[in-house]
Amino acid sequence: MKDSENKGASSPDMEPSYGGGLFDMVKGGAGRLFSNLKDNLKDTLKDTSSRVIQSVTSYTKGDLDFTYVTSRIIVMSFPLDNVDIGFRNQVDDIRSFLDSRHLDHYTVYNLSPKSYRTAKFHSRVSECSWPIRQAPSLHNLFAVCRNMYNWLLQNPKNVCVVHCLDGRAASSILVGAMFIFCNLYSTPGPAIRLLYAKRPGIGLSPSHRRYLGYMCDLLADKPYRPHFKPLTIKSITVSPIPFFNKQRNGCRPYCDVLIGETKIYSTCTDFERMKEYRVQDGKIFIPLNITVQGDVVVSMYHLRSTIGSRLQAKVTNTQIFQLQFHTGFIPLDTTVLKFTKPELDACDVPEKYPQLFQVTLDVELQPHDKVIDLTPPWEHYCTKDVNPSILFSSHQEHQDTLALGGQAPIDIPPDNPRHYGQSGFFASLCWQDQKSEKSFCEEDHAALVNQESEQSDDELLTLSSPHGNANGDKPHGVKKPSKKQQEPAAPPPPEDVDLLGLEGSAMSNSFSPPAAPPTNSELLSDLFGGGGAAGPTQAGQSGVEDVFHPSGPASTQSTPRRSATSTSASPTLRVGEGATFDPFGAPSKPSGQDLLGSFLNTSSASSDPFLQPTRSPSPTVHASSTPAVNIQPDVSGGWDWHAKPGGFGMGSKSAATSPTGSSHGTPTHQSKPQTLDPFADLGTLGSSSFASKPTTPTGLGGGFPPLSSPQKASPQPMGGGWQQGGAYNWQQPQPKPQPSMPHSSPQNRPNYNVSFSAMPGGQNERGKGSSNLEGKQKAADFEDLLSGQGFNAHKDKKGPRTIAEMRKEEMAKEMDPEKLKILEWIEGKERNIRALLSTMHTVLWAGETKWKPVGMADLVTPEQVKKVYRKAVLVVHPDKATGQPYEQYAKMIFMELNDAWSEFENQGQKPLY
């Protein structure tokens, strides 16, 4: 009861406080809620306002298509008068911007056919109305440039604002012509480079560049004045046939001729009556016989009809090409005008134009001038006092602009600027590089002729700069030929230094210049007594040559330096005079040529081993069927030891391999023993090829290692001299067995031509001397032994053995080698895209490095085939080889791949497995 009473007593006291706290909480929460809403709203409005302000600021500053080419020449796109969302240049924005910077000091030149209210720009708008997709008339171009110059001359604060529909081609040709008019540049190249740098993507067509060249002629130091003789265009010839029909094998062309914007002649007739030209026709010939004068435009179109009945069919046309020129710049004796593809306008789809596409006009100039009503603006124009600084606000800006025009990349050589942007018939025109001075005369804006504007074409070539040449030319550049003349001069030969005391007689100082810088092998060859230019068999030469002598004496130049197959009557080792070692210097005995004469003969010139060695010329080389003994050093690092010392009575390795045969370093000589049996070793040849051989003073037990078996040589000091590790001197008290040779010969047979490294070195420098001899001897080994039994040592390949080989031989006599190579490539792989792609690296032309060979494992799925095929097309596409010597070859490869891909698609693009 007490607890309940206490509960009842406490409840009334708690209810008021509980209710007040609840309302207080709701009140405070609502206050915080509205406060948060208010703060969030203020932040949102503030953020929105700041973003709007920022967007307006960025729009007025950065979103306008507005470019200062110079501080006084401005280029922009067309200012739109009405509100168009997404259009960058609004008239009001442009006016606000110009008024804020150039109030009352700007004039707008509208080059487009569209117009707007000129009051928006304070009625300072010149309507030029240049034609669309054409170069402006030369008359109008010159007049606008002169008007701009007059406006800039009136006040240093005046600026010119130029615009067309997109601010690209038409505006760029006017600004470029203005640079030439003010003598800033004398050729079109630097002007166009400056425009590309300031406003990328200007898209000047060949006709635009041609007209800039006309401006250079008109304003040269000796200005060219166009003649007024009418031109008769007799016919137009187009070859080869472009591919504009649906079958991509021809077109149905017609031709329009315009003077300015006025069409004066057209060959378009009824669709059914017009001739359709095919590829097999070779060329398009259309007679015209029309006389023109001034700015001439020749356009050719392809006429096609949509599918449907005659009443429902709709005839449309597609432009094939367009060309424009001024008749006043054609030389008087011209009869043919040729335009190649780079000199034609509107050639936007390269796949539709075959290689070597060109247009030829058969023309004739009339002998008399035609009377014109309007005097050209360049007539009686004084070329004085025209200063290019009028285009800039400061001298520094002038210099920076010149540098910018000269530093842009160059695509066309600047050596002949007079033919810049012209076709071949302008060859006789004089495009001067000299600056000319001109004076100005006031002209009203009403003198401008109204013509249509021009839209930008595709961006074409960047052009060369004469300023770049002027800056790059150095007066000392002519000294380069003299440097080249000094390079091949041989350095003075080193003096003869007898460091080891091996020679006592004076040496000849006349040396021939070495063919290559001396190598280690050449230096070491002198240590063995052979010069770098000495003959392979210098039997008459006794003694050891200088250690550091890089080349042989002049008296030994009559013999070839290296001879793998030449023989000599005295095949002696050049360490001494004898092929075998005789410590007592017994005179050598010349022997006749026999089966083993090259191994057993000694030097024909005997010498005393204990006397000072003397030099003698090379002996006479006699022909023999056996290879010569040669220790001539190999420049690649090996030594050619073409005879086995073991056969001469010294075991497998004799002391003749060392530069000094005695312990005192005296050059000793060997001679053939008097009782040597020449056939003593024949019985042990088969069993001793790879066996360990003891080194005995006699050669009866010596064997012959394989030809290409490298023998490791390690120098060992022997009383002031050195000796190979595996070879033993006759003075050694006890023999030492030789380690077995590694088997590297392809056949197990005796070899009489030993080749091993005589000096320690890298592994790749040992045993290389026999490589060039080995291949020559394998072809006819044992031919003399087996020929009597009806065997041939090698295959006699005198002619083709199969009908296919005979057919190929006949085809090679008449067919183009490139086509023959393509036929060999596709043989057995016709229309097999996988096989062709995996072997395409075998037929690519020399110098092609983009293509990486692919295997059949990379061509399993259709997706892989498609990916590799696209890469192959990018490599061999004919358009990328335009003008290259392999252009036709790339086209043949592309056609084979294209046919194979079509077959692959027709078969459903099946996977490999």
Curated annotation (Swiss-Prot):
Biased composition, class Polar residues, residue ranges: 506-523, 599-629
Enzyme nomenclature, EC number: 3.1.3.-
Keyword annotations from UniProtKB, A to Z: Acetylation, Chaperone, Cytoplasmic vesicle, Disease variant, Hydrolase, Neurodegeneration, Parkinson disease, Parkinsonism, Phosphoprotein, Protein phosphatase, Repeat, SH3-binding
Compositional bias of kind Low complexity: 554-572, 654-669
InterPro entries linked: C2_domain_sf, DnaJ_domain, J_dom_sf, Prot-tyrosine_phosphatase-like, Tensin_C2-dom, Tensin_phosphatase, Tyr_Pase_dom
Domain J per the UniProt entry, residue ranges: 849-913
GO cellular component: clathrin-coated vesicle; cytosol; extrinsic component of presynaptic endocytic zone membrane; intracellular membrane-bounded organelle; postsynaptic density; vesicle
Gene Ontology terms, MF aspect: clathrin binding; clathrin heavy chain binding; heat shock protein binding; protein tyrosine phosphatase activity; SH3 domain binding
Xref: Gene3D superfamilies: 2.60.40.1110, DnaJ domain, Protein tyrosine phosphatase superfamily
Domain named Phosphatase tensin-type: residues: 55-222
Domain C2 tensin-type residue range list: 228-366
Modification type Phosphoserine: residues: S112, S453, S456, S563, S570
The Sequence repeat ranges on this chain: 36-39, 40-43, 44-47
Record-annotated active site: C164 (phosphocysteine intermediate)
Residue interval(s) of motif SH3-binding: 409-417
Residue ranges, annotated region (3 X 4 AA approximate tandem repeats): 36-47
Comment field on protein domains: The J domain mediates interaction with HSPA8/HSC70 and is required for basket dissociation.
Job description of the protein: May act as a protein phosphatase and/or a lipid phosphatase. Co-chaperone that recruits HSPA8/HSC70 to clathrin-coated vesicles (CCVs) and promotes the ATP-dependent dissociation of clathrin from CCVs and participates in clathrin-mediated endocytosis of synaptic vesicles and their recycling and also in intracellular trafficking. Firstly, binds tightly to the clathrin cages, at a ratio of one DNAJC6 per clathrin triskelion.
Subunit structure: Forms a complex composed of HSPA8, CLTC and DNAJC6. Interacts with HSPA8/HSC70 in an ATP-dependent manner; this interaction stimulates the HSPA8's ATPase activity. Interacts with CLTC; this interaction produces a local change in heavy-chain contacts, creating a detectable global distortion of the clathrin coat. Interacts with AP2A2. Interacts with DNM1(GTP-bound form); this interaction allows clathrin-coated vesicle (CCV) formation at the plasma membrane.
Name the record gives this protein: Auxilin
Organism: Homo sapiens (Human)
